[in-house]
């Protein structure tokens, strides 16, 4: 099989040969015709006249050389086009196939690398999950037969109650009140454990004494009564609920005042004020009147 350069050189040589042959034939024909027309003697044969008339193109001496040269040039151009274009097309096709194969290999390698990265990321998490929790050194954990799968892990030194403290005599058990002495540098705190009777703690210095909050206990001295229906209205103020004045629709105008029933017109200010009770009719000393005309 010839190479591309050799094929090009041969086709160019053939084209030059064809063109030379055509030019030579055309020149020979023209010279012979010129000589025939300018001959000194004219010989007429039978049926011929000395007149000039139209002649066929095929009878011209230049017809066949010109037609042959044109056909040769067309053939040479076709051969050159096919000889040059077919190898170029095949070369491009091979390059496209090679690029496609390289792209496919690159995609496969990227997929393999991605799978390796996923497996490497999953393996450390599995190793962390499979590791068993280790107990710290120097800690003795007692066996608890009641602990199950869904029960929280409880340190037996502290017990199930987080408020319990370590007791050297019985691990996990509640401490008795007032078993620990006062630590230096700390204020003595009252016992926080339950089971103590009320009102056993004395008043702490620096704190105001609070009234009792438990029911059924007598009030402390110097404190007003906290039971309902025992508070009398203070001078200058309206009676409070439960202070000896019943509530409901029996209250009069204003705010829970006995007298007139409650209704939409219970507040008739600014003309009537708020219907003060008899012991609140006058203003307080040093203050202007609160309701009614001024």
Curated annotation (Swiss-Prot):
GO terms for biological process: adhesion of symbiont to microvasculature. Residues 241-256 have a biased composition (Gly residues). Residues 234-294 are annotated as: Disordered. The chain crosses the membrane at residues 11-31, 66-86. One of its GO terms (cellular component) is cell projection. It is found in: Cell projection, Attachment organelle membrane. This is P32 adhesin.
